[in-house]
Amino acid sequence: MKREGVLYIISAPSGAGKTTLCKEIIDIFPHLRHSVSYTTRQPRAGEVHGKDYYFISMDEFRSMVDKGEFAEWAEVHGNCYGTSIRTLEECRITGIDLILDIDIQGARQLKERYEGGVYIFILPPSYEELRRRLNGRSSDSDDVISRRIDAAAGEIRESRWYDYIIVNDQFSRAVEELKSVVVAERCRTFRVLETVTERFDMG
């Protein structure tokens, strides 16, 4: 029997390198897929509709909320983000492992609604490095950067309830640590026991 897909929920303060890490780990594992979220924010340079996000209007987003189409959604820095229930159910049934690159509010909602998710928090090495990375983003204004820095302290405090914490100081090391989490979680007894029981007639 095919095992259910694993949900890897990854959160971080803006500038910690979460999105880059997620893209790297998806390139490494062919059966790992990125969950494409819906958002009301404007696309950044190089972002593609349907690949990075589904970019929709606020009216469209509210309509999806009213219809109960989101497994989780939240407003972050003035923009709305959401994960569709259909995406999660399709991957669970087909055995596809899914990376969810979402904020803390959304992660909390998922933890309350779904069992078996793996919660991973990505940290920058320091506040100083976080500010340096955010200042390097040409797409963000000084006001946006200041708001993100102010929010980071509260976000980092929330890391205590995640299953894993990875400090993204040296990128290659952070990738290896994230790889280790993915491999270990796939081997958890409760995920593979049904298959093993059938294969070795343990019933």
Swiss-Prot record:
<keyword id="KW-0067">ATP-binding</keyword>
<keyword id="KW-0808">Transferase</keyword>
<dbReference type="GO" id="GO:0005524">
    <property type="term" value="F:ATP binding"/>
</dbReference>
<keyword id="KW-0547">Nucleotide-binding</keyword>
<dbReference type="Pfam" id="PF00625">
    <property type="entry name" value="Guanylate_kin"/>
</dbReference>
<dbReference type="GO" id="GO:0005829">
    <property type="term" value="C:cytosol"/>
</dbReference>
<dbReference type="InterPro" id="IPR017665">
    <property type="entry name" value="Guanylate_kinase"/>
</dbReference>
<keyword id="KW-0963">Cytoplasm</keyword>
<comment type="function">
    <text>Essential for recycling GMP and indirectly, cGMP.</text>
</comment>
<dbReference type="InterPro" id="IPR020590">
    <property type="entry name" value="Guanylate_kinase_CS"/>
</dbReference>
<dbReference type="InterPro" id="IPR027417">
    <property type="entry name" value="P-loop_NTPase"/>
</dbReference>
<dbReference type="InterPro" id="IPR008145">
    <property type="entry name" value="GK/Ca_channel_bsu"/>
</dbReference>
<protein>
    <recommendedName>
        <fullName>Guanylate kinase</fullName>
        <ecNumber>2.7.4.8</ecNumber>
    </recommendedName>
</protein>
<comment type="similarity">
    <text>Belongs to the guanylate kinase family.</text>
</comment>
<feature type="domain" description="Guanylate kinase-like">
    <location>
        <begin position="5"/>
        <end position="183"/>
    </location>
</feature>
<dbReference type="GO" id="GO:0004385">
    <property type="term" value="F:guanylate kinase activity"/>
</dbReference>
<dbReference type="InterPro" id="IPR008144">
    <property type="entry name" value="Guanylate_kin-like_dom"/>
</dbReference>
<feature type="binding site">
    <location>
        <begin position="12"/>
        <end position="19"/>
    </location>
    <ligand>
        <name>ATP</name>
    </ligand>
</feature>
<keyword id="KW-0418">Kinase</keyword>
